[in-house]
């Protein structure tokens, strides 16, 4: 009887399936480094995935923060190229690991587990948002909660974004919690002082996860203020803004102390105003990533996304517009709460245009646009509920199994195919084997490389503000290598060529002091150069 009752409400079973897979991924992924870009193993390497290259920058700073109590990268270099709140959360994990004598591999496993539970909590909050949008009917509230929960935790694209290890999961959770909290405002005709302080604190902490959340908050407060009783809401919105600003201002003080500017070094490295040459490329990526998010990443092959998405939206159009009772399903939402959701939509949509105009890092666009899921997933779940509620039970079960099946197909193809994603996972092992700590290694991509090798210094400016000073002082990167006594350069061949080997006069000057390292890095993309006369480790035999 209990089992039959459990099957009627299968959410606990599905949570167990999700957690079982996620914990297997965290505990049984391999330590060490792959020796090639394809390996004979169904489990990934911790140095490669699910935690990714860019997350290892934050993990390095978090590890150093726990060890040395300072926000620094390798060589005790003060840095601003992080998202502060998630770094401090990770630093707590790192401190516990160090206290108990653990190593960096254990630290990575804990970060994965943390983000697995963050996604689970996010699913609960999004489900709670969906419940609040449904008036009165408790059974219907549970159904939309259940659907929202399932399409959140079994969304492989979202799972991979969250377990990548950056601030994304925690950031989405805080935005969702902020959105959920505002739905409580509909119960009060007058917004109270206490609500302003709580909401301001919540949004201030969200700002410490991504500073550009300020754009979203500003958009929401403008919509709220212009709605009605403008004078009262202006005072309330100003109190929210001041509370949030009070929370984030210490971070800006730190950034200014380290760099003399208010923009973190990672922002300077990624920012570049769009021009005509970039226009089509950037907005093509925008289109692909928005489609990917809206189709819940069910389609992995990039070239098929636009075609499949067109078919997907055509089906939606037919169901919701030709069959009016499906379209009207969205009209039954609680009117006042729907109004607040609409404010969030208006606040989030500008992200689609702001990021491609001001930021060149197109590989981050999916992460930048992911806050759209906060309002999209609950609304989609409500629409799916209306679509499926009168269908046979087998049809409803089969529809849910599609999401679960696509999740595990994505997981198998991405994590368990034996394919290495990040060349730096191979390069990190190569550096550790070939260059002891007395060598100082420079690289533009130092996420994985710098986390596992403390003798690596960042050369692209994400973590190292000195690189941005070179442009201000009109100095070359080669000058910086000399000044910092860097003996080894490891990076993709195209980056080395662009920075040091083009044009010919620059190549001649560089090769006068540097030579190719005789041992090849087995990833097929990364090359290594060493000084002809090293500043350090002069007696190391493999160097000569």
Can you describe what each PLM-predicted range is?
Residues 1-544:
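Membrane-proximal envelope and lipid/glycan-remodeling enzymes
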């Amino acid at each position: 009887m209990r089992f039959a009752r459990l099957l009627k409400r299968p959410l606990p079973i599905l949570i167990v399936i999700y957690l079982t897979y996620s914990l297997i991924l965290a505990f049984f992924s391999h330590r060490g480094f792959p020796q090639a870009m394809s390996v004979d193993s169904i489990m990934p390497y911790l140095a490669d995935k699910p935690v990714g290259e860019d997350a290892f920058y934050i993990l390095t700073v978090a590890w150093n923060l726990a060890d040395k109590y300072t926000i620094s990268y390798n060589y005790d270099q003060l840095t601003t190229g992080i998202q502060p709140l998630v770094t401090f959360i990770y630093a707590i994990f790192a401190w516990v690991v160090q206290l108990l004598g653990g190593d960096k591999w254990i630290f990575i496993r804990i970060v994965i587990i943390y983000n697995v539970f963050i996604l689970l909590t996010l699913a609960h909050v999004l489900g709670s948002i969906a419940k609040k949008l449904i008036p009165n009917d408790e059974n219907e509230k549970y159904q939309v909660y259940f659907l929202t929960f399932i399409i959140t935790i079994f969304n492989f694209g979202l799972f991979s974004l969250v377990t990548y290890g950056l601030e994304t999961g925690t950031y989405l959770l805080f935005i969702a919690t902020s959105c959920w909290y505002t739905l409580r405002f509909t119960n009060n005709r007058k917004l109270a002082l206490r609500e302003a302080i709580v909401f301001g604190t919540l949004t201030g902490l969200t700002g410490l996860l991504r500073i550009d959340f300020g754009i979203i908050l500003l958009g929401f407060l403008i919509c709220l203020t212009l709605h009605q009783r403008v004078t009262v809401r202006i005072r309330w919105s100003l109190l929210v803004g001041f509370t949030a600003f009070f929370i984030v201002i210490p971070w800006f003080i730190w950034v200014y102390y380290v760099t003399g500017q208010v923009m973190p070094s990672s922002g300077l490295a990624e920012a570049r105003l769009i021009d005509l040459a970039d226009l089509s490329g950037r907005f093509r990526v925008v289109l692909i990533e928005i489609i990917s998010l809206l189709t819940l990443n069910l389609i992995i092959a990039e070239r098929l996304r636009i075609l499949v998405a067109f078919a997907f939206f055509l089906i939606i159009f037919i169901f919701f517009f030709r069959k009016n009772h499906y379209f009207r399903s969205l009209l039954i939402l609680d009117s006042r709460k729907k109004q607040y959701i609409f404010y969030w939509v208006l606040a989030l949509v500008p992200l689609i245009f702001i990021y491609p105009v001001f930021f060149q890092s197109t590989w981050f666009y999916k992460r930048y646009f992911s806050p759209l899921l906060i309002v999209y997933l609950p609304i989609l779940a409500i629409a799916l509920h209306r679509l499926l509620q009168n269908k046979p039970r087998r049809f409803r079960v089969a529809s849910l199994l599609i999401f679960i099946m696509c999740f595990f197909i994505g997981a198998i193809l991405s994590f368990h195919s034996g394919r290495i994603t990040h060349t730096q996972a191979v390069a990190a092992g190569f550096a550790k084997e070939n260059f002891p700590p007395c060598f100082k290694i420079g690289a533009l991509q130092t996420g994985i490389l710098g986390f596992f090798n403390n003798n690596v210094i960042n050369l692209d400016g994400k973590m190292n503000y000195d690189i941005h000073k070179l442009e201000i002082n009109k100095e070359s990167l080669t000058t910086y290598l000399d000044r910092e006594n860097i003996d080894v350069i490891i990076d993709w061949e195209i980056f080395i060529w662009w920075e040091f080997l083009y044009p010919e006069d620059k190549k001649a000057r560089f090769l006068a002091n540097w030579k190719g390292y005789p041992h090849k890095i087995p990833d097929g993309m990364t090359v290594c150069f060493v000084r002809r006369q090293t500043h350090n480790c002069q007696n190391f035999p493999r160097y000569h």
